[in-house]
């Protein structure tokens, strides 16, 4: 049998990993064996944190809504319950955005919710 060398394939695979490892510290950006471990771990972190980001942002929106609602003598849970009773269907992301950037609009929503407590 003839000898098969995977020069081009191997070189391209190494280049791909080293390109992903660009900016890493120490040998992790230049040594293939170290770089492949670091890139795999980085991809695991990225996968995990894409899911955690959704969790974190929901918590942030709830904190912002709660802080804005407490200025109007309400608590977050009461406010959300009152919104549901009032038939106002706005998600937390939009409510938090209104609370931060459009206080007049948020106040009108709070007043409508207060009427249904």
Swiss-Prot record:
CDD domains: Ribosomal_L20. The gene is rplT. Binds directly to 23S ribosomal RNA and is necessary for the in vitro assembly process of the 50S ribosomal subunit. It is not involved in the protein synthesizing functions of that subunit. InterPro entries: Ribosomal_bL20 (IPR005813), RIBOSOMAL_L20_CS (IPR049946), Ribosomal_protein_bL20_C (IPR035566). This is Large ribosomal subunit protein bL20. GO terms for cellular component: ribonucleoprotein complex; ribosome. It comes from Rickettsia massiliae (strain Mtu5). PROSITE patterns: RIBOSOMAL_L20. Keywords: Ribonucleoprotein, Ribosomal protein, RNA-binding, rRNA-binding. Belongs to the bacterial ribosomal protein bL20 family. GO terms for biological process: ribosomal large subunit assembly; translation. One of its GO terms (molecular function) is rRNA binding.
């Amino acid at each position: 049998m003839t000898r098969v060398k995977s020069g081009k394939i191997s070189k391209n695979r190494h280049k791909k990993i080293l390109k992903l490892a660009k900016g890493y510290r120490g040998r992790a950006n230049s040594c293939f064996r170290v770089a492949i471990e670091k890139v795999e771990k980085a991809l695991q972190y990225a996968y995990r944190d894409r899911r955690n980001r959704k969790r974190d942002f929901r918590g942030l929106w709830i904190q912002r809504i709660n802080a804005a609602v407490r200025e109007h003598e309400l608590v977050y849970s009461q406010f959300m319950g009152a919104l549901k009773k009032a038939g106002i269907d706005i998600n937390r992301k939009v409510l938090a955005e209104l609370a931060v950037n459009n206080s007049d609009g948020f106040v009108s929503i709070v007043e409508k919710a207060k009427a249904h407590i």
